[in-house]
């Protein structure tokens, strides 16, 4: 085991790497002491050594993996814990330490003195945490019980895996996997740490596994690190350096380099941390090509600086071609461009690259080129090149350091140590191949998998392994064994895994470095094989696997396959098992590689389809770098097949690449399909897919198998939509590969390819193909030539470029115009395609400059063509020109050439060109300065001086960064010096964060740059000078907003600048964070700079309101030297200074206490002890700050001086922080355990909320009260429940707290459910918590509904499992309406329809159909009970299909899904609301669903009607007011489909015109009338005409449309009502005004209906006072003198009739004017108060909806405008003969239900029944059966007539006149009323009423409700129900 500690620019990491060394020494793990000693060394160096203080300060994460172990074979937990305490952490106590050793206290004390832990860092602790059902059985355990450290900031991550798997987390070859897992885990647990740029692990040399040689290796490296050359390389902090070292053949350079890196880091004399990332794929036994090295360097840079991926967006045209094209020179060219962009892009940290150059002279020269490239910039880059060289052989390049371990002049002691090291490592006797063969034979025969793996790992480190060991030799070795077949079969059955690994290794199926990935893929465990034997048998053919993008089967593997297939799977195809063989291994690759795109789910069950899916994704992984939503391709194509089959790596060398694709076209099709999916491309049709098959291409083009496969792969990765696209692509491929035959074939197939294709092919063509293509073009256009020219420059095809230049020049000269004027060559506009915009984005000169082609630039300049001058074409603002490209790429020579040509006048550019800006606001000067190109900066500054104009050095880009600010930020000393001394520079410029050049240098740790800036003391000023200079500069020239330098300007006059007095920098200036330069320097602990700033009169005390006072910063940093420095210079420890609170941070004493700086604390407390009571901005005392960071040594000092108040504050902080040992100290010193802070929180509440079980336990034992509440009325139990503190909650429950008590309106269970804390809910349920919904959550129906809405499925399942009675009905309704289906799935597990009543015949399928989503509906249908209700529906509800059509959520999808599951779309239920699904969809105006249903339904079903509105058209018209336009469209659809305007239910609902008149706007009415004019004369079931309903809707325009000879305003319905009655009832004053404008209509004013109600009655019944007022005023005018007598009739109240006044009073009409008009005096009106209803509830006589509250108005919006039965349902038998109604009286909100069969109803009448016949109300005889009592005192009501107009509401009316009390009614109050049989009960239908009076005063008695039902009419249709009368009273 080993511990590595490494640091980098943003943090540090401690990682434990576990490795089982069982090759030759199968012993236990190394002693734990070694582990802890090494970790101690790293931590002590980081915490105490001044050299490494920056590393310690920046450490943000400590990661422990598998620490410590607990096993019967290893150390006990106690000893491990003691060692950990002694060697690593001080004062650490964990509950698993059961027995403390005798010397425990001494160890702790010694640890506290010797070591201070890095308390700032977060701790990530990974351990084993198997579940109760986990199959893991492991002897070595890393469990929570022994791995938890118990320190602050610790994040615990439990994994259900074996120790073997856990330990191997750090051995994964793809280190990004571990990085991703660590970062994700930390983020999931709420711990954010700084960005980790990479991971590196120190490991032993792979060649030698013994422990000794590893330390000898470190000895060698230690001597190597002490070499002067290496010291020089390490000390260069700014310049880019190259380190060369040669290694013997037996020494793995990668391993040596790893050890070297570690040694350099540990001995780093600089303050800057070093980080180096080595790609595991770099170690190869074959020679790397130049493109491979370039690609590897790009990968290494991007892994260290992942943010640089955005820099690749600006690459030019052929970036993608490098991955798809064929010519290596173009690949290399593009990769160079990518590498230069990454090298030169501004970076805030150093970058390291490693090259294993082996013995290739070519790669050594490449490294030399890189060194020269690096010298052009000041950007820091470290390049390490490893060369396996022979004696006297050095790299052929000029390098700064040459170190060759094999050189004769090499340091002799170092040589001796190295040779001894190698000799000792070979003493095992494996120096010769014979011994290796013998050992391998022995290992394979033994069946020991672990031994075989490590032996093969050892052998694979030598270069001769892959050639010496092959499949034939291994297979022959196995076949030599006796009974070979039996032997193999037996080993397959018993040890299926061990045989596969050697064969895979020997065949190079996987690289040797990937052995652990194979282990994981095969799911191997320590003690056995996981999986079925058949799985491993299927994996044996995995010897042939994915190899560089092509699936191949090597011929020398065929014998093995033939044997295995013949033995086990003779009846199956080969490729099927090849697919199975790769699935497991590839799955691991896909899991750990984030760059692989996610494929759509493949529904194919064929194994070959799975193979192609994984293979395609594996191929994409090789060349794609995922960047957000884009993919930048820069790695060369991985295919190893070349045109020349005799080349190395060709098919012939591999004994014939598999012809599986040609033999099986189906496999080829699958491969192409999944490859296109992996690239996110559209699929191909069958014909197009056939064209790109390898066999088709081979026969069409006459090419070999290898090329056919490769071209097929290229075509499969392109966007193809037609056969022409295939031909054009083949033309380009033929041009790229210089295949004239392919080009001719393509031109023959398509003689007229697109200009884009021809231009691309021409740019890539050689001379013969170029001539052929130019002949094909004929007379090319300027645009074609321009596109081809740009492409040829990108490809570096000089020959084509020169030819095109000649052609363009001739064309221009002949035309005598510039292409800008005479052709279509223009810059792309906004409406042009992105492809065109990208093509024309750069000029030819700019493209050539970007690629650094000096020859092409000369060619462009020397041609007499003016239109590529930098200004001639006047590109739009923000366009890059050649100077930008030269500055961006560090092309100094090209920059010189361009500037020189400008001076000569060859390039007719103006003086403003060097000041033009890109889209980001960058000038060439800013680009060069931000990349450290100091020579280019000097050129630009010098050129401006020579030409007589000034380069604007003060321009700032979008980020407000100028050239000077960029140089200061990145510490480019030479660039910075030039700019600081340049005339006209503005030193006071700041960036977007308000940082000056000095701020940037200090913030980015550029100490040298800061010193360089401070050396120019003349640029600094005091505050007054600073303000004056700024004012002067702003008044002279302010160029920031000046647009005179816009590139689009046509003014070419040179600009002469007026140089103002330059503003200087103030030392008091603050950046955007409020920090001064002095404060930043203190934070960085830069003492020398602090001294300089103080000497320059920087304010040591800081100005008033300073964000971070220097004294506070010094106290927090803990530098006693800095602190005393401030004391000496005058920053005295005055009370004001010490009490300074830096905004948002802390005081000096608080900062020192929190950081544990004891010396500073004592210094601060010398003179002012009162500081202990001061609080910071977080209201914490210094003691609290020390407790929060567990600074025990500071706490001891503070406790001796604390007051009682301070001790109390400390107690709360200790409880919050979980410091139990400090809690004990504070309680012993007198802190009150039950004290409450200002928010009412006690220590117990703090500990409970923050999950500190040890503190809770101590407080409970100390007698803490459980009933105390905080300011939110929450107790400790509620705090623990809502914060997820399960352990403290368990402690509280165990001590007996009431778990069902409410606190603050919530119970603990409700809080835990709301917080989604499963453990807490479980604890509470086990503790006896009941299913009680708290008062604060009363808006939910029950606890389960509350859990469904606010909590997780796990908690819901936990509640459902509890043995509590529960009602699932409301819970199911709530779950069905949710978007997520997780809660619904849980409920379905417990759903039993027999036990759950959803009401009114509803089923769960109905709920899901109307309220749920498609996913929820699918879940319900999949349930056992869901499908049972598919075509079932209650009468009033309808079927699920009907509900889905009515739904507003995914209605069409749900309808389609139900139909696919056998739902009947034509099912008709006339009694339901809509009747059919079509009607429901029409009402919802859901035209897609309507169209779908019309296609599925029969013609006879589409006209079916429902109970509410009628057929589909009527339902649509009923809701047309919501969307008129959509309704008109839907009406046309329904009419076209044959839906009738006169439905079968017209006798009940009327025609469609009735519905339109009542609900729809005028356009719909017009549309219906146009369709059928005759409908205006049709009547509905109540005799109403459409004009009646329009009057009710107050639509006068519609009434005019509906007027006919038989349909007028005088027409009456069956109740004798005309349009005036209905308009008055609806309050339609505008209609009444129109009607009474005609004098002939005045008689309608007093027209009475059959009940005797005039428009006055109906106006008083309505709600519009204006309408009643209008009628009264109109009556006064019409009747004039007769009005007084008429008015008396209107207000006279008697027992016979209801006057308008009665109606107004009953309906609470309070308008004084109306009442006065009805005959009341002024005094009576002022004192009159309406009768109150005593909160009586009942049913509305209009809509049967419940009525509540004092005023008798229905709560339903459609009460008036739907059924129009304003005065009661008492006439229902006559109005709607087919309808059946039941009325349920209510009393004070509680229903009293009566069954039909009941003949006796208990009631107490308050008034006799008053019978009458036609005419005035009269009383009949008073005999028995006529309303009197019988012998038993029971009154009968059989023969009493009931008024048609009184209705139910009149029965429940209150006494209006107390004087009309019948004296004989009192004796009937306590008697029952009997209801006669059907034959006996006959009620006349004349006008009359049933009236209720009071015995006493109406204000003293609460009246009861009486309701009466009418008998059926005298017709042939008799009702089934008898007429009943009900009456109730108290």
Curated annotation (Swiss-Prot):
Pathway: Mycotoxin biosynthesis. SUPFAM superfamilies: Ankyrin repeat (SSF48403). Keywords: ANK repeat, Repeat. SMART domains: ANK. It holds the Pfam family Ank_2. ANK repeats lie at residues 840-872, 878-908, 920-949, 959-989, 993-1023, 1073-1102, 1106-1135, 1144-1174, 1178-1205, 1206-1235, 1239-1268, 1272-1301, 1304-1333, 1339-1368, 1400-1429, 1514-1543, 1548-1577, 1615-1644, 1651-1680, 1696-1724. The keyword Repeat applies. Ankyrin repeat domain-containing protein; part of the satratoxin SC1 cluster involved in the biosynthesis of satratoxins, trichothecene mycotoxins that are associated with human food poisonings. Satratoxins are suggested to be made by products of multiple gene clusters (SC1, SC2 and SC3) that encode 21 proteins in all, including polyketide synthases, acetyltransferases, and other enzymes expected to modify the trichothecene skeleton. SC1 encodes 10 proteins, SAT1 to SAT10. Trichothecenes are sesquiterpenoid toxins that act by inhibiting protein biosynthesis. This is Ankyrin repeat domain-containing protein SAT10. The gene is SAT10.
């Amino acid at each position: 085991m080993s511990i590595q500690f490494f640091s980098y620019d943003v943090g540090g990491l401690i990682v434990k790497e576990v490795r089982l060394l069982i090759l030759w020494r199968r012993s236990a793990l190394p002693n734990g002491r070694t582990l802890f000693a090494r970790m101690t060394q790293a931590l002590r160096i980081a915490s105490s050594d001044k050299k490494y203080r920056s590393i310690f300060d920046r450490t943000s994460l400590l990661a422990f993996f598998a620490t410590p172990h607990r096993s019967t074979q290893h150390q006990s937990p106690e000893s491990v814990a003691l060692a950990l305490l002694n060697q690593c952490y001080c004062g650490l106590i964990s509950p698993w330490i059961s027995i403390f050793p005798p010397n425990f206290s001494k160890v702790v004390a010694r640890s506290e003195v010797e070591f201070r832990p890095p308390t700032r860092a977060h701790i990530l602790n990974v351990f084993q945490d198997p579940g109760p059902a986990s199959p893991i059985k492991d002897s070595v355990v890393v469990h929570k019980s022994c791995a938890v450290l118990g320190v602050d900031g610790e994040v615990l991550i439990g994994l259900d895996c074996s120790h073997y798997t856990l330990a191997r987390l750090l051995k994964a070859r793809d280190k990004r996997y571990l990085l991703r897992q660590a970062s994700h885990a930390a983020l999931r647990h709420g711990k954010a740490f700084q960005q980790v740029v990479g991971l590196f692990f120190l490991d032993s040399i792979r060649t030698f596994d013994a422990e000794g040689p590893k330390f000898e290796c470190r000895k060698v490296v230690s001597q190597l690190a002490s070499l002067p050359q290496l010291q020089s390389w390490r000390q260069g902090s700014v310049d880019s350096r190259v380190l060369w070292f040669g290694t013997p053949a037996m020494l793995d350079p990668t391993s040596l380099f790893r050890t070297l890196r570690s040694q350099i880091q540990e001995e780093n004399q600089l303050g800057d941390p070093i980080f180096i990332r080595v790609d595991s794929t770099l170690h190869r036994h074959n020679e790397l090509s130049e493109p491979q090295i370039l690609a590897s360097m790009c990968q290494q840079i991007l892994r260290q600086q992942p943010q640089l991926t955005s820099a690749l967006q600006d690459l030019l045209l052929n970036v993608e071609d490098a991955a798809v094209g064929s010519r290596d020179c173009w690949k290399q060219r593009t990769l160079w461009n990518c590498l230069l962009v990454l090298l030169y892009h501004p970076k805030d940290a150093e970058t390291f690259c490693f090259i294993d150059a082996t013995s290739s002279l070519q790669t050594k020269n490449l490294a030399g080129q890189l060194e020269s490239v690096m010298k052009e910039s000041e950007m820091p880059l470290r390049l390490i090149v490893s060369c396996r060289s022979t004696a006297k052989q050095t790299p052929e390049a000029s390098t700064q350091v040459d170190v060759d371990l094999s050189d004769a002049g090499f340091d002799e002691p170092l040589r001796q140590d190295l040779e001894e090291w190698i000799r000792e490592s070979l003493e095992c006797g494996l120096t010769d191949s014979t011994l290796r063969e013998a050992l391998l034979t022995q290992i394979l025969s033994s069946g020991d998998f672990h031994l075989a793996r490590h032996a093969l790992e050892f052998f694979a480190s030598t270069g001769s392994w892959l050639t010496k060991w092959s499949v034939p030799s291994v297979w022959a070795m196995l076949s030599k064994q006796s009974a070979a077949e039996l032997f193999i079969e037996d080993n397959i059955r018993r040890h299926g895994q061990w045989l596969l690994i050697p064969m895979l290794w020997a065949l190079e199926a996987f690289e040797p470095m990937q052995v652990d990935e194979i282990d994981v893929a095969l799911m191997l465990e320590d003690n056995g094989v996981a999986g079925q034997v058949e799985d491993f048998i299927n994996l044996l053919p995995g010897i042939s696997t994915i190899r560089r993008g092509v699936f191949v089967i090597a011929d020398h593997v065929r014998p093995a396959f033939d044997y295995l297939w013949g033995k086990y799977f003779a009846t199956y195809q080969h490729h099927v098992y090849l697919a199975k063989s790769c699935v497991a291994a590839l799955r691991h690759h896909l899991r750990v590689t984030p760059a692989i795109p996610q494929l759509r789910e493949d529904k194919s069950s064929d194994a070959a389809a799975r193979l192609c899916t994984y293979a395609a994704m594996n191929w994409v992984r090789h060349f794609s770098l995922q960047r957000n939503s884009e993919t930048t391709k820069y790695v060369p194509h991985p295919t190893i097949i070349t045109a020349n089959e005799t080349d190395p790596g060709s098919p012939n060398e591999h004994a014939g690449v598999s012809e599986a694709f040609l033999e099986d076209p189906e496999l080829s099709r699958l491969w192409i399909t999944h490859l296109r999916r992996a690239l996110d491309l559209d699929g191909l049709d069958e014909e197009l897919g056939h064209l790109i098959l390898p066999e088709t291409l081979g026969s069409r083009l006459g090419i070999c198998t290898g090329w056919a496969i490769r071209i097929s792969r290229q075509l499969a990765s392109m966007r193809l939509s037609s056969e022409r696209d295939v031909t054009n692509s083949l033309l380009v491929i033929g041009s790229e590969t210089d295949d004239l035959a392919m080009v001719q074939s393509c031109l023959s197939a398509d003689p007229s390819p697109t200009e884009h294709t021809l231009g691309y092919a021409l740019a890539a063509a050689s001379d013969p193909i170029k001539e052929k293509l130019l002949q094909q073009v004929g007379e090319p256009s300027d645009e074609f030539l321009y596109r081809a020219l740009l492409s040829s420059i990108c490809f570096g095809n000089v020959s084509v470029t020169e030819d095109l230049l000649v052609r363009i020049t001739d064309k221009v000269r002949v035309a005598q115009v510039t292409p800008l004027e005479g052709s279509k060559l223009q810059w792309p506009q906004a409406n042009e395609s992105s492809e065109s915009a990208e093509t024309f984005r750069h000029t030819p000169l700019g493209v050539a400059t970007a690629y650094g082609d000096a020859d092409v630039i000369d060619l462009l300049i020397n041609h007499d063509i003016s239109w590529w001058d930098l200004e001639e074409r006047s590109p739009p603002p923000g366009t890059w020109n050649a100077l930008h490209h030269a500055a961006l790429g560090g092309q100094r020579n090209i920059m010189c050439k361009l500037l020189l040509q400008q001076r000569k006048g060859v390039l007719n550019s103006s003086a403003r060109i060097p000041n033009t800006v890109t889209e980001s606001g960058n000038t060439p000067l800013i680009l060069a300065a931000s990349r450290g190109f100091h020579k280019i900066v000097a050129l630009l500054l010098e050129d401006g001086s020579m030409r007589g104009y000034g380069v604007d050095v003060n321009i700032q880009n979008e980020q407000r960064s100028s050239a000077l600010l960029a140089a200061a930020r990145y510490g480019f000393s030479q660039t910075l010096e030039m700019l600081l001394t340049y005339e006209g520079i503005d030193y006071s410029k700041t960036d977007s964060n308000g940082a000056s050049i000095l701020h940037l240098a200090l913030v980015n740790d550029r100490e040298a740059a800061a010193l360089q800036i401070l050396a120019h003391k003349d640029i600094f000023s005091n505050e007054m000078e600073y303000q004056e200079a700024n004012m002067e500069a702003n008044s002279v020239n302010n160029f920031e907003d000046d647009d005179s330098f816009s590139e689009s300007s046509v003014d070419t006059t040179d600009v002469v600048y007026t140089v103002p007095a330059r503003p200087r920098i103030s030392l008091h200036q603050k950046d955007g964070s409020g920090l001064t330069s002095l404060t930043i320097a203190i934070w960085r602990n830069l003492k020398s700079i602090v001294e300089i700033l103080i000497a320059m009169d920087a304010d040591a005390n800081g100005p008033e309101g300073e964000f971070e006072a220097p004294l506070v910063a010094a106290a927090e940093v803990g530098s006693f030297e800095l602190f005393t420095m401030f004391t000496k210079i005058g920053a005295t420890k005055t009370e004001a200074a010490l009490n300074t609170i830096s905004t948002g941070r802390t005081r000096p004493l608080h900062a020192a206490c929190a950081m544990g700086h004891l010396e500073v604390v004592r210094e601060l407390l010398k003179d002012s002890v009162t500081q202990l009571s001061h609080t910071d901005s977080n209201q914490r005392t210094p003691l609290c700050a020390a407790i929060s960071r567990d600074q025990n040594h500071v706490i001891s000092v503070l406790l001796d001086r604390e007051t009682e108040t301070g001790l109390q504050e400390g107690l709360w902080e200790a409880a919050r922080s979980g410091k139990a040992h400090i809690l004990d100290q504070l309680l012993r010193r007198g802190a009150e355990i039950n004290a409450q802070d200002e928010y009412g929180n006690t220590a117990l509440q703090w500990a409970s909320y923050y999950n500190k079980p040890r503190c809770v336990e101590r407080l409970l034992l100390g007698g803490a009260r459980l009933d105390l509440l905080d300011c939110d009325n929450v107790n400790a139990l509620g705090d623990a429940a809502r914060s997820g503190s399960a352990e403290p909650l368990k402690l509280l429950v165990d001590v007996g707290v009431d778990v069902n008590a409410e606190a603050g309106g919530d119970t603990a269970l409700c809080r835990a459910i709301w917080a989604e804390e499963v453990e807490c809910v479980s604890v509470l349920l086990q503790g006896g918590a009941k299913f009680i919904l708290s008062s604060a959550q009363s808006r939910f129906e029950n606890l389960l509904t509350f859990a469904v809405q606010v909590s997780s499925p796990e908690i819901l399942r936990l509640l459902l499992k509890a043995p509590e009675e529960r009602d699932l009905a409301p819970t199911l309704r709530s779950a069905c309406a949710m978007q997520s289906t997780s809660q619904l799935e849980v409920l379905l597990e417990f759903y039993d329809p027999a036990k759950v009543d959803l009401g009114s015949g509803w089923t769960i399928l109905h709920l899901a159909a109307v309220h749920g989503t498609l996913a929820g509906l699918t879940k319900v249908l999949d349930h056992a009970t869901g499908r049972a209700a598919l075509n079932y529906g209650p009468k009033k509800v309808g079927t699920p299909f009907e509900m889905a059509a009515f739904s507003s959520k995914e209605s069409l999808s749900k309808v389609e899904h139900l139909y696919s599951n056998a739902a009947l779309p034509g099912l008709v239920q006339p009694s339901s609301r809509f009747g059919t699904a079509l009607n429901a969809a029409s009402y919802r105006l859901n035209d897609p669903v309507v169209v779908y249903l019309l296609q599925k339904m029969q013609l006879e079903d589409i006209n079916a009607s429902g109970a509410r509105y009628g057929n589909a058209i009527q339902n649509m018209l009923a809701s047309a007011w919501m969307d008129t336009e959509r309704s008109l469209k839907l009406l046309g659809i329904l009419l076209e489909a044959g839906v009738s305007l006169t439905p079968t239910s017209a006798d009940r609902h009327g025609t469609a015109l009735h519905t339109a008149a009542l609900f729809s706007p005028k356009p719909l009415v017009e549309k219906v009338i146009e369709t059928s004019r005759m409908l205006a004369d049709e009547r509905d079931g109540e005799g109403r005409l459409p004009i009646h309903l329009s009057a009710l809707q107050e639509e006068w325009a519609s009434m005019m449309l509906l007027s006919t000879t038989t349909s007028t305003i005088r027409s009456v319905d069956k109740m004798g009502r005309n349009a005036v009655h209905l308009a008055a009832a609806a309050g339609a004053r505008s209609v009444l005004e129109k009607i009474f404008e005609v004098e002939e209509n005045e008689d309608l004013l007093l027209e009475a209906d059959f009940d005797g109600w005039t428009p006055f009655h109906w106006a008083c019944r309505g709600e519009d006072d204006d309408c009643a007022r209008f009628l009264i005023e109109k009556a006064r005018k019409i009747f004039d003198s007769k009005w007084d007598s008429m008015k008396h009739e209107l207000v006279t109240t008697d027992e016979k009739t209801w006057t308008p006044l009665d109606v107004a009073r009953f309906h609470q009409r309070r308008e004084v004017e109306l009442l006065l008009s009805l005959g009341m005096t002024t005094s009576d009106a002022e004192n009159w108060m309406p009768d109150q209803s005593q909160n009586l509830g009942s049913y509305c006589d209009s809509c049967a909806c419940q009525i509540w509250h004092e005023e008798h108005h229905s709560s339903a919006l459609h009460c008036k405008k739907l059924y129009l039965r304003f005065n009661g349902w008492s006439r229902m038998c006559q109005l709607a003969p087919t309808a059946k109604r039941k009325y349920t009286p209510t009393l004070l909100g509680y229903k009293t239900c009566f069954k039909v069969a009941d003949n006796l109803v208990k009631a107490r009448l308050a008034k006799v029944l008053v019978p009458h016949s036609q005419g005035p109300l009269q009383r009949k005889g008073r005999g028995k059966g006529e309303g009197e009592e019988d012998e038993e005192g029971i009154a009968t009501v059989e023969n009493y007539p009931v008024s048609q107009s009184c209705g139910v509401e009149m029965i429940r009316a209150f006494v209006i006149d107390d004087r009309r009390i019948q004296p004989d009614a009192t004796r009937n109050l306590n008697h029952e009323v009997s209801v006669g049989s059907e034959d006996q009960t006959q009620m006349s239908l004349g006008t009359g009423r049933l009236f209720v009076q009071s015995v006493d005063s109406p204000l003293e008695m609460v009246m009861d409700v009486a309701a009466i039902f009418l008998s059926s009419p005298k017709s042939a249709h008799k009702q089934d129900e008898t007429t009943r009368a009900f009456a109730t009273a108290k």
